[in-house]
């Protein structure tokens, strides 16, 4: 700054800026004051024009001078760069060195000559009086450089940890140790605290009645150690650390409890903090959702919170009708109470649903379709143990079998052929078309098959721009049903028109199953997979050839008056949704097909249910049911009068 303005000019500028000379060189401050004074001295603001001109000239001169000084310094700094200096010992370096010393040759030359010292006569040999150099004294050990190595096995080495503990050790200077000993005892109401000397430093060991983070203790101690060194550690083995600090090279200075810390005198709560309160187990909720294959957040939440009721006060448990419910209720009661009081109920259930979806996707990618179908049948058998109980229920399900037999005389062969189609999943041989007039039984049979195999029903009569998210429902599903697809032209004019057939024509890759297609859901990334096989149901619409060739089989339905009349007189089949259930279709296979047609894993279940059905109804009684269906009567007229 001395090279920028003269002394007089500098004083004059600082006076105009109304700053003391001690602020000379504080360029940011001078800049702010310059802007303030410009407004004050400006003629338009009523200021002095001469003062304004002088201020501008001096300040601009200062700026130019400062920039020129900086440029000069940069040039001086960049005269020689390390990249320009050759390697030492090479001819290039010798040449560079001679050039570098050219400018200094005259200034550093010395022409003086030293007079030669007079020659001394050779002294006579005298006994040597020299002695060995005494050994250097060892420097005193500085214990402030690192935490004592003797204690490392007892403390935590975590750098960043949110874990809360109750036992700590602090390493600092002797002076700060005196202060911190009292401050820590007062601040945290320590249940035990002791001070130990270690060379020229101090270690403070203490136990707190409540849990704290190591960072919280460290920050408190730092407030009293702005210059002095400080190490703060969490202790994993409290008694081991204390006993080690009572032996050399450590010395016990003082402690708040006479006699010190004894191994058996402290409860676990004193050493490791208050006992941990039971917390909500998200994993237990996920296991419950996996066991019952629940993929609905709100249904899972509602079902699980029911377990918060005490098992002895639960109606289902007291009836002893469902052993599974009682077992699950007892296992999940305590966790359900915690869920009921939790503020993250939905988050816990959402994670459980994610586990169910993840398990389903894993099975789809690793198990064969035959294994998946067998697993589905096992689930239905478990449901049958709870639902198909007692004579009345069994007769209702047998009535549904009689009704399906009236729909198609070879209904069992039709179902077996469809299951083979679904399991094989051959490209271009993966879909059946159920076609017929209104109220002919298409949707009833399609829904029963869907519930037998597991899957979703899709509506593709929507606009094409909404179709991707509707198709995304088929992610990880075993099969699908395109329900009630509408076309543009129908055999009967009263049929409404729709986009279904047109959309179906644009989904050839989905129907063929030759290539993977992209499926997407909201808030889920797109995923490529072979679209699942299934069924298409529609009324009597005209189908383009490009769509018709993609159906492996077309099943034509006709209106049968006796079927409608028998259903009207046996309303339980519809009101209890027995006809649409997968259990009814599985019992149909058990009734008609031999045991050998089933997978070996479930043949024992098939044998059991064949015996159950034979105990409640024989061939004569079943023939009576079929006759009632044919005549349009109440199917269970003989039993339920």
UniProtKB/Swiss-Prot annotation:
UniProt entry keywords in alphabetical sequence: Acetylation, ATP-binding, DNA replication, DNA-binding, Early protein, G1/S host cell cycle checkpoint dysregulation by virus, Helicase, Host nucleus, Host-virus interaction, Hydrolase, Inhibition of host innate immune response by virus, Inhibition of host interferon signaling pathway by virus, Inhibition of host JAK1 by virus, Interferon antiviral system evasion, Isomerase, Magnesium, Metal-binding, Modulation of host cell cycle by virus, Nucleotide-binding, Oncogene, Phosphoprotein, Viral immunoevasion, Zinc, Zinc-finger
Cellular location(s): Host nucleus
N-acetylmethionine modifications at: 1
GO CC term, one of those recorded: host cell nucleus
Sequence ranges assigned to domain SF3 helicase in this UniProt record: 410-572
Stored InterPro entries: DnaJ_domain, Helicase_SF3_DNA-vir, J_dom_sf, Lg_T_Ag_polyomavir, Lg_T_Ag_Polyomavir_C, P-loop_NTPase, T_Ag_DNA-bd, Znf_lg_T-Ag_D1-typ
Modified residues (Phosphothreonine): 133
Protein name: Large T antigen
Top-rank taxon, per record: Viruses
